Amino acid sequence: MADITLISGSTLGGAEYVAEHLAEKLEEAGFTTETLHGPLLEDLPASGIWLVISSTHGAGDIPDNLSPFYEALQEQKPDLSAVRFGAIGIGSREYDTFCGAIDKLEAELKNSGAKQTGETLKINILDHDIPEDPAEEWLGSWVNLLK
């Protein structure tokens, strides 16, 4: 089993690029990783460390590729008390639902007993053309919280 499972939800690929970049950085730091783009709930370990990275689609909506995962969290209410997670949202402050998808995912993970490590990073694409940069900066402090 990987030390850290990265879960990405993306419409245009931005969150996937961030997940791949962070997986590379985590491996350079000595962690093993598994990156899953739009996984189903049953594809994930019910314990360990998850890093959830999601863009926001439409009016604060979960990206299509992560909707089945989100809906399973809501409907099945799995026991995720053995999961610690970090969260990164990507969105635009032009919308009043800025990073609404990561807010929804974070809430459902907590409702299922998962414990959040660190604060959620919310990346405004209007300020960061390359969302990998602020995500990498955040990752350094997040990894320290895992120790």
From Swiss-Prot:
Pfam families named among the record's database cross-references: Flavodoxin_1
Protein purpose: Probable electron transporter required for biotin synthase activity.
Name by which UniProt lists this protein: Protein MioC
Cofactor: FMN
Top-rank taxon, per record: Bacteria
Any one of the GO BP annotations: regulation of cell division
Keywords, comma-separated and alphabetical: Electron transport, Flavoprotein, FMN, Transport
The protein's assembly and partners: Homodimer.
Homology family: Belongs to the flavodoxin family. MioC subfamily.
Residue stretches making up the Flavodoxin-like domain: 4-143
GO cellular component: cytosol
Organism from which the protein derives: Escherichia coli (strain K12)
Designated gene of the protein: mioC
GO terms of molecular function: FMN binding
InterPro entries for this protein: Flavodoxin/NO_synth, Flavoprotein-like_sf
